[in-house]
Every structure is written in C-alpha cells, then in structure tokens.
Amino acid sequence: MVKGVIFDFNGTLFYDTPQQEKAWREFAWQNFRRDISDQEFKELIHGRNANFTLEYLAGRNLSKAEVDAYVKAKETVYIDICEKDPQNTHLNSGAERLLDELKERSLPLAIATAAPKINIDYYIKKFNLERWFSLDKIIYNDGTIKGKPAPDFYLKAAQALQLDAKDCLVFEDAISGIQAAYNANIGKNSRYYYH
C-alpha cells in the first residue's frame, strides 16, 4: 500500500527539457567552448546533479567554489530562458489536479530533485509549490547528497516523509532517476516504467 508520494521535478512536474538543454548548451559553449550531444544529455546530464555534469564538461575535478560559481552562472541563464518563455513555463498538464487529489487524500508528498537551491527558490515562487509541499519535504542538490542513480535523494525524501522507501511511490522521468528509485527500494512491489 502506498503511504507517500515522491516526485522528481524537472521533466516530471515541470517539462523544462528544452529550456534546460538550451541553458546547458549556452553555458557549456560560454565556459568550456564545447557542444553537448543529445546522447550526452540522455546519459550524462538529465537527472544528474550539477557537480557530476560540471566536472564532466570541464574534464577535471572542480573545487566547491568553482562548482558554486558555475552553478550560479548556468542557473542564471536557465531562469532567464524560463522567464522569457512564460507560455512554456508552467506545471505539466494534469499536475495540479493530481497534486490536489493526493493532498485531498492526505497522502504525504515530497520532491526529490537534482536541481540546486537557486532553482528551487524560483520554482517555489513561480509555481506556488507550498500549496502541496512543505519546504522541509523538498529535497534538492545542496552539494551533500550523492546524485542519481545513487538512491540518496529518494532515501532522504522518504525519511522526510517519515516513511520506509518501500511504502512510497515515485514519479520520475529520467533513466538515472528510475535507477535511483529502484536502488532505494522504492515501492518494493511497484513496477518501473520509462517513457
């Protein structure tokens, strides 16, 4: 029986893949003079935390100060892209209805996302996420959580809900996120689908 629901955010509740890819491409060219292939997005960027992606793009280990500066620069580009495209900057169709229904059923909800704090602050304000999610149940990339496909984001989200991971249901769109949910033993008797 499902006792709590955990959502990935980017690509799941908010389809921002075009905005993310545009921002990553602009950022990678400005900072590393390199392009990013569709295959790299699929396997090495979508669903991953910024530390992993930035070190991959840089081709070397980065200091915390370098990662922080690069994250701020990339996410500033991303937020600017979103703000210039209000027609495509909204929660996915049906998301609000689903969240309202889950809240009405008193199911505890959490978010487990590789997005950094700068983006979380933007999303909370832009989408009024506090209607459904307590701030302490939004697990984001603060630099201390091992990135997906490691189970850490989902385990921390289940812990925030005060539930065993096996009693949670996850909504996720990225291969690395599905692997993370599986690795966390989320919904032990659930099935995993990739679209």
Indicate residue ranges for each PLM-predicted region:
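N-terminal helical cap/lid subdomain that shapes the substrate entry/recognition surface
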Residues: 2-96, 100-105, 118
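Active-site flanking residues adjacent to catalytic metal/cofactor-binding acidic residues
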Residues: 7, 171-172
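Conserved SAM-binding loop
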Residues: 13, 43, 109-112, 170-171
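Substrate-recognition "cap/lid" segment bordering the active-site pocket of phosphatases
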Residues: 88, 116-169, 175, 179-183
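Short glycine/proline-centered loop/turn elements that form peptide/ligand docking sites
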Residues: 96-97, 174-177, 188, 192-195
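Hydrophobic/aromatic residues located in beta-strands of well-ordered beta-sheets
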Residues: 109-111, 138, 168, 188-189
